[in-house]
Design a protein with these regions (language model features):
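C-terminal and inter-domain tail/linker signature
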Residues: 1-114
Length: 114
C-alpha cells in the first residue's frame, strides 16, 4: 500500500504552505537527510523553512503531479508567491519510512536566473 507515502508528502507540503515549522518534527524522521542541502534531521528542515518564509512570506508550493511507487514519491510542483519572475518549478523525490520522510532529493529552477 502506498497511501502512507502519498500522505507523508502531502503533509509536508501542507505544513510548508501553512508556515507550520514545528510540524517538521512529526513529518521527518530523526535521521532525515536532504541530499540537495546536505543537512540532517527535522531541525534542519525547520530552519530552512523559517529562512525561506522570512524572504518569501507569501510563498505557496502547488503539487502538479505525484507518482508513488513502493516507499518513494516523485512530486512535480510549481512555486507561487515569489515576486518578479515566472513561477519556479521543482521535482522532489521522497523516501518514506514508518510514515515519515527519511530522505529527499530535488531539482529546482528557483536558483536559475530568470
Amino acid at each position: 500500500m502506498t497511501d502512507h507515502v502519498r500522505a507523508a508528502a502531502q503533509r509536508m507540503y501542507a505544513a510548508f504552505n501553512a508556515h507550520d515549522h514545528t510540524a517538521a518534527e512529526e513529518i521527518f524522521t530523526s535521521d532525515f537527510y536532504s541530499h540537495p542541502l546536505g543537512t540532517t534531521g527535522p531541525g534542519s528542515v525547520t530552519r530552512s523553512w523559517q529562512q525561506f518564509h522570512e524572504v518569501f512570506p507569501d510563498v505557496q508550493v502547488v503539487v502538479e503531479d505525484m507518482v508513488v511507487e513502493g516507499d518513494t514519491a516523485a512530486v512535480r510542483t510549481s512555486v507561487r508567491g515569489i515576486p518578479g519572475r515566472q513561477p519556479p518549478t521543482m521535482l522532489e523525490i521522497f523516501r518514506v519510512r514508518d510514515g515519515r520522510i527519511a530522505e529527499l532529493w530535488g531539482l529546482s529552477s528557483l536558483r536559475r536566473d530568470s
